Amino acid sequence: MTNIRKSHPLIKIVNDAFIDLPAPSNISSWWNFGSLLGVCLTVQILTGLFLAMHYTSDTATAFNSVTHICRDVNYGWLLRYLHANGASMFFICLYLHVGRGLYYGSYTYTETWNVGVILLFAVMATAFMGYVLPWGQMSFWGATVITNLLSAIPYIGTDLVEWIWGGFSVDKATLT
């Protein structure tokens, strides 16, 4: 008589993915962070979509829309806090994932490592946009401080910063 976990078509999929996974015996918990990145990214996308359904980018009503999300939307406060803290968890997992790669010498696989570096820069640019877009003084501060780093580029730095800002300083809502 065969074992049900190896003969049943649906249970066999779960068995092959979780129980009889062909993984080396010396694998450590450091290898979980890639999967945790996927979980965090999924949570970020889903909570971001649900928050975007109620968010208003107009400067006069943006704060009221956040208040509406927290008070009137069912579990809106939970969505907001999951989205905010999920971003922090995402970057913690990301840095631990990169640290694991450095520790185990994954940089010797240059093609794979270069793709990872490009993905890291893309994630940082996306996080910057997500940080700067909402209305508020903190996003103004973030936009000013982070983009001012470009002013260190010789000759074109100041012009580049003014081009990104659209003027001499960050002003109005950055989302519209």
From Swiss-Prot:
Task: Please give the start and end residues of each transmembrane region.
Answer: 33-53, 77-98, 113-133
Q: Which GO terms describe its molecular function?
A: metal ion binding; ubiquinol-cytochrome-c reductase activity
Q: Which domain of life is it from?
A: Eukaryota
In this chain, heme b b562 is annotated as bound at H83
**Cofactor binding: number and manner:** Binds 2 heme b groups non-covalently.
Q: Which residues take part in binding heme b b566? A: H97
Cofactor (UniProt) = heme b
* Family annotation (InterPro entries): Cyt_b/b6_N (IPR005797), Cytb/b6-like_sf (IPR027387), Cytochrome_b_N_euk/bac (IPR048259), Di-haem_cyt_TM (IPR016174)
One of this protein's Pfam families, by short name? Cytochrome_B
- Compartments (UniProt record): Mitochondrion inner membrane
* Record's keyword annotation contains Transcription regulation: no
Give the matching CDD domains. Cytochrome_b_N
Q: Which GO terms describe its biological process?
A: mitochondrial electron transport, ubiquinol to cytochrome c
Record key words, sorted: Electron transport, Heme, Iron, Membrane, Metal-binding, Mitochondrion, Mitochondrion inner membrane, Respiratory chain, Transmembrane, Transmembrane helix, Transport, Ubiquinone
Q: What are the record's GO terms for cellular component?
A: mitochondrial inner membrane
Task: Tell me what topology the record assigns in the membrane.
Answer: Multi-pass membrane protein
Q: Please share what else the UniProt entry notes about this protein.
A: Heme 1 (or BL or b562) is low-potential and absorbs at about 562 nm, and heme 2 (or BH or b566) is high-potential and absorbs at about 566 nm.
The record's comment on protein family reads: Belongs to the cytochrome b family.
Q: What is this protein called?
A: Cytochrome b
Q: Which organism is it from?
A: Mormopterus kalinowskii (Kalinowski's mastiff bat)
Source organism phylogeny: Eukaryota, Metazoa, Chordata, Craniata, Vertebrata
